[in-house]
Amino acid sequence: MSVLFTLKQYVKMVIQNKYLPYIYQKACKKPVKKGKILFADAHHTELTGNMKPVYQKLKNGGYDIQLYCEDIQTMPVWRMIAFMKEFMQVYAQAEYVFINSYFLPVSSCRKRKETTVVQLWHSGGLMKKMGYDTTEDIPKYYKGNPTANYDLVTVSASCCEAVWEKALHLSQGTAKALGLARTDIYFDKEWNADNKCRFYQRYPEARNKKICVYAPSFEGNAAHPYNRGIESGILDIMKHLEKEWFFIIKVHPHMEKNYPMYHCDFSTEELFAVTDLLITDYSSVVYDYLIYQKSFLLY
């Protein structure tokens, strides 16, 4: 693990454990506002995953909704701190907060009881360790609890509840099998047909070929991700089969900077409609793909 990464973690801990709680406590002088809802994401500049359909459902309900979505990995430190400060000031008066993955400001303080934090966890299942079950996700030296203050964590099935509670150090009953809002779109015939049409317009050379999507996960952590699959010889296999197959390599969002040559204009979800074979390693994308009842290969 690099010295720079470790240094960043310590700076992050100081901000999370000292500065943000101070900002929150000052803002708590004002009461919680009924109907005030926040959607927050520190990895994307727009709503993604389960948050998007939940927002669409709530936006016309007369609620006071605010979005806090930024990719903090791309922000200068001063902007990141300003973003978190603004969030904490509003967090102190929010009735509900929705997040889609780790969002450290939410867990940086002891929140008010009147505020409910809902973690709309993004994956449909697990094929690898996460959270406190792996030191790569949450280093042992990290002081703080990135999953504190969660009142509800939504998961895809009852068999996932105990697994999530163990991995994220949640109280029993916090994880509930309420399903994933984002998977509803997979049953929309018009959406699937539109994705097919756009795909063949973008890749006319894929017509009359079988479509294979290679969508590996990543190893390491979000700050220093890596992937062994792409370097393991799978590209040679693709080359031998390119007469009959059209291959799309869809790397994990954390890996896009490392592999810009594999950029694809379509999200993995949008590719499902045209995919004949999905190849992945231990990515949770396979749980989504199973809805289409098509072939997949773990490599």
Named regions from a protein language model:
Residues 148-153, 246, 274-277:
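Short active-site oxyanion
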Residues 29-38, 62, 114, 207-210, ...:
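A short, charged/proline- and glycine-enriched loop
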Residues 115, 277, 293-297:
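Structural loop-to-beta junction motif characteristic of Rossmann-like glycosyltransferase folds
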